[in-house]
Amino acid sequence: MKKYEAMVLSCIDPRFQPKVYKYLKVKKLTGKYSSFTIAGAAIGVTAKKFKKWHSTFFDNLSTSIKLHKINKLIVINHQDCGAAKIINGNKKFNLLIEKKIHKDSFRKIKKVINKKFPNLKISFKVLKLKD
């Protein structure tokens, strides 16, 4: 079985897909990663609001580690994220609040990854939708 480099966790937002592809191409990862796409990316797999989704992601990550021999998780969130707005509820929402939500989701996923998959490297990126 061929060894791949990583699993990429990214958001379902259609506006975001070309950005993810371009980012991974620049990183020379085309054809070298498995992919998991879910609303909010790290937000979707860590927020209590989306708890039912969490095990599905971690089961897929475990499968990719076994089948594809990956050694890294690349988490790519984006600005203007609808999932961030959903978990924020009806409260005031702005870029500063959204940055905190992304940061919290990265902290939470890193904690779980370090516990469940201690040998797995992890990287985080928040992409802008507009240049």
Region roles according to the model:
Residues 27-30, 67:
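Short glycine/proline-enriched loop/turn "hinge" motifs that connect secondary-structure elements
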Residues 78-80:
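Short, ordered loop/turn segments at secondary-structure junctions
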Residues 31-41:
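A short beta-strand-loop structural module common to alpha/beta enzyme folds
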Residues 1-20, 39-53, 65-72, 82-131:
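Divalent-metal-activated hydrolytic enzyme cores
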Residues 24, 59-65:
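Short secondary-structure capping micro-motifs at structural edges
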Residues 29-32, 119-121:
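A generic structural signal for alpha->beta connector loops
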Residues 21-27:
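Short Gly/aromatic-enriched secondary-structure transition segments
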